[in-house]
């Protein structure tokens, strides 16, 4: 092996399916690890190199600190040398916080807040006038000039437009020795026991002094101004005794017309996550929750007794239905009247209640006399459950009848009026955060010429920081995002590239970066900019490892490691390591696709479709410009375009929610659109995404596809099981009976080590088999249920060749290229691409009407050229049966087959 310091050397890696491999990765270079889906790329990059790097870093902490950091198992590897500190940038969209935005994640918004706090100009939100502020000397000067020889009152404002009787306040004023106050514009004597109408809004000022302004240096005026400033917390008013006109003066920012004043701005005043800056109505979220009547009464053809009001369900013998029945009597209707035949007033009363008392007859409730109540309404009932003190279950239940709407107070800006009144070159901070990054960068490059000399001096360093960070975002192809874009709505590829831009911005050196398919979701155009950014990271003195299938990325790399030869058990070896030029001369599966020996062929002829179309008209969500789109049915349709062009908005956020609402009464609201036509030509919609099959390690391909039920039924029918009286539950590892109770069917035990990582050891009772001894004694063709779960799909296809019900379901998993995974493999160990193909296989094995619409978002994520060929065969099978497949994709091999 080479000199160790120039290379990262991995010896004897055995994580997952790696076959005791050695690997050598040059430092300070761009290395691509490629190979089939499931060949061991991520096992080498993330589960071995990154896991060991992170573990070594955590080892440097004290035992006390390690206690809080959770499990970091030592990867199964002999040793790794030459390892630098490791930073992993994965695709997972980890951020589920609705307050997190592109601006806050990249910290650009923090710099903008600083810019506005230090260099922003304040305007009054009442009059639009520019705010002014004075020193005490300037105020004195102004009064001497403006009121020379006039009789004036010096006032200190104490209450501005607030309710209350203010009895205690007047008492305090009298104790301080002041004789007069000005209440709601009228000067009065401060009398003992004085108080105001507590339910009205009032303005109260204390009269500090009444004097005639002299034309020379006036000591009395000077003292009165100082006292008024103290009493009025930096504000004072001057009342002209003759004309009764008032002027406002302040040490703080103040509107010269209305007297409105702002506190000195600080960065937190521009943060929607701080009470000082957030809009008081929506608490800085920009949206509020509103009850959606269409979700309460989705079908007006039903009657109330037939369940038209979803929160109430069908009519029962209960108080709420007696109340509604009594309420309907005055409209000459009953609970059996369809809602569409009820007058609007009746529906309004049912929803929003009324103050009128309703008579409930004694015969109904079995009492001696009639009963009178007021009905609060269904909406009020749901709103009560949304309150903070309701239980989490009740809140969740109520939430399904609500929809989010733009906050009526801040109109989505998230900030309070004061924060939005600070401007730089006519723009407030919200207007900057809604610009796309390209536009914002141009604006900031030209803003200097509009700033005063003082503003320029203050802003120079802040602007430099913001421009640098924006430039990094532009370099990784994110020019179409805006700073106020919610982090939750970003795709995996986008959030990964944002983290990449942040890392380039951090200017670290001697670090090992590991990235997981950064080119996901990137159009070919943006890909070159991404490669340039990765090379920039390398040229700063870092090592970069990229797990990637992209042809351009492989050819631009300094070094390529190709994993294979196949996937799963048949993979886990290094089939090639060297430069891209050397790779083109070899005969690995990857190199054959790169040098053109293998290719995905263009179809000889295109499908005609079934003659029908689905039309979506007037789509205008996010950045869509009122578009009309035709989807011809019975075809493979590819939706493509540069990053941020609106593909996901059109399909995932508009079309799919419309169809889900129509077919499954889904509660997800589509974005704005005009109309949809042609729904009668499809009968179901299936969204096949890359999310995990299940949330727990107990879910696996057998349980997800439903074949596990068939396998359990097969075992129940065996003579041995019948003699013992076993039912299907006996062969489940999720319920007690047949499972091993020592490990509760997990197959392993977790041993808590307190300040060391938790250790997972095979259960000493069942030795990882999950079932108890009696259950394992029932065998089919010599194999127990645990043996069956441990089989690969390829082996299971041979094993069950004479059991058509099981064979049909697992054969399809084999056909989508997953013959190497095990039937009982935990779904948490499957990659995104593998999970998606298990879902596709499940759909393929279902009874098929030929009128299904399938939606796939970037299905080639994580797939090698060969995997894409297999995937396209599967999709073509679906379309050949008459179904329609819509694919959002940038991959040219997929586009050319559409």
Predicted regions: what they are:
Residues 1-898:
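Conserved phosphate-binding elements of NTP-dependent enzyme cores
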